[in-house]
Regions:
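Interfacial segments at transmembrane-helix termini and the short loops linking adjacent helices
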Residues: 4, 112-134, 327-359
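Signature of the first transmembrane helix
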Residues: 9-74, 103-107, 172-173, 232-262, ...
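Membrane-water interface segments that mark the loop-to-transmembrane alpha-helix transition
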Residues: 12-24, 62-115, 126-136, 302-323, ...
Length: 387
């Protein structure tokens, strides 16, 4: 009976996420086309690389977010709501501290990097500065809302997650149409639009959690062990996040240093395509991950392993079905979608799709590993190999 209810819940949540995916993918791809046409290739490339600077510092958030999601879902699986409130409150405080740390480094090291290392035309440096400031604001707002997002996902309220995501992309589409008719610096205006959308998204997240989940009411506990538990777990996950940074934004920075902004534009478009196609498999991943952690918390190891195996096969198949025709007809797809696009966009897209196929096989095993809490050895190994 328990398995049937879990499978039914996963199926329902997956359906909601596919509805979200369909709407978000169509709107996002169309929005990207309008943004590229409105900003132009050079400004689009500047936006991509400048916004990427802040990512050099947010790998810390990736580690802490993973810890927050794991511990919230784990305690919810055990149905220990007192401990759940303690974990949520400690996680919120930790994310506030992290946001302040990132703000310090972003405004010091990041600003220096912007003016001294990136290849940006001198007449666009002022615009690049404001894009960077907006990227910092958007990132910090995203960091402090992580505990609320983790709580929604742990409760498996995928409908709310879907509605908020659709709201996000539709609002951006409305704003980009507005952008086309304004006589302002379009690059700067688009950066401020990102901040505005993030503020609204965070507000809705907070209101929903505060109304439906009592454990989201912040209480300040003096139990140092709570904060230590989250930070210790995050520290080992930090090693893995560092390797991801080296692969992702490190590549972006190197491309800019050795080439020019049009290459960053090509990679930025490829990353947009990756974000769209990965949703075909990640919807099932998002729906299944909370169940994997909860099953481990309850000691249902055999059921957890069955879920991991079945989910891995289905995720790879869903992604492969979509990725294969895209790879075979990449030139045609880019022509229909963008019209004019930067050189090397095809090559970047094919490489990124291949990487996504590999990741779809291992993602559930990573979730199970995080559920156990024993992540020290694996992250050290990955960090040494990739970095």
């Amino acid at each position: 009976m328990g398995n049937h209810l879990n499978n039914k819940r996963i199926a329902k949540n997956t359906l909601m996420l596919y509805i979200r995916m369909g709407v978000s993918m169509i709107v996002s791809l169309y929005t990207s086309r309008i943004v590229l046409q409105t900003l132009g290739i050079e400004d689009y490339g500047i936006y991509s690389v400048v916004a990427g600077i802040i990512s050099m510092f947010t790998f810390l958030n990736g580690a802490l977010s993973q810890a927050t999601s794991r511990f919230i879902t784990f305690e919810l699986g055990k149905k220990d709501f007192v401990q759940l409130n303690k974990i949520f409150s400690a996680a919120f405080v930790n994310h506030i501290i992290l946001a302040l740390i990132i703000l310090f480094f972003a405004e010091s090291i990041g600003t220096w990097f912007l003016y001294n290392k990136l290849v940006i035309p001198e007449y666009r440096l002022d615009a690049a500065f404001w894009v960077y400031q907006c990227s910092i604001a958007t990132t910090l707002l995203g960091i402090v809302q992580v505990p609320y997002g983790s709580l929604i996902m742990a409760h498996e309220k995928m409908g709310i997650y879907a509605y908020l995501s659709i709201f996000d992309v539709v609002l951006k589409l409305i704003l980009v149409f507005l952008l086309s008719y304004l006589s302002v610096d379009k690059l700067i205006f688009w950066a401020f639009c990102g901040v505005f959308v993030t503020i609204l998204y965070n507000t809705f997240n907070y209101i929903y959690c505060h109304k439906h989940f009592k454990e989201s009411h912040i209480s300040f506990y003096k139990e140092i062990s709570l904060y230590k538990k989250l930070f210790t777990y995050s520290f080992w996950d930090f090693i893995g996040s560092l390797s991801s940074l080296a692969q992702g934004q490190g590549q972006n920075m190197m491309l800019n240093i050795f080439f020019d902004p049009t290459i960053n534009a090509a990679r930025g478009i490829a990353m947009t395509i990756q974000g769209a196609i990965v949703q075909f498999s990640s919807n099932f991943t998002i729906a299944s991950n909370p169940q994997i952690t909860k099953l481990y918390a309850n000691g249902n190891i055999k059921e957890m392993m069955n879920l991991i195996y079945n989910s891995s096969c289905l995720s790879f198949f869903l992604l492969y079905v979509f990725a294969l025709p895209l790879c075979l007809e990449i030139d045609y797809v880019l022509q229909i979608w963008l019209g004019t696009y930067p050189d090397y966009t095809q090559i970047f897209t094919l490489l990124i799709i291949t990487n996504s196929l590999i990741w779809s096989i291992k993602s559930y095993r990573v979730t199970a590993l995080h559920a156990t809490g024993h992540i020290k050895l694996s992250n050290l190994t990955v960090g040494v190999i990739l970095c």
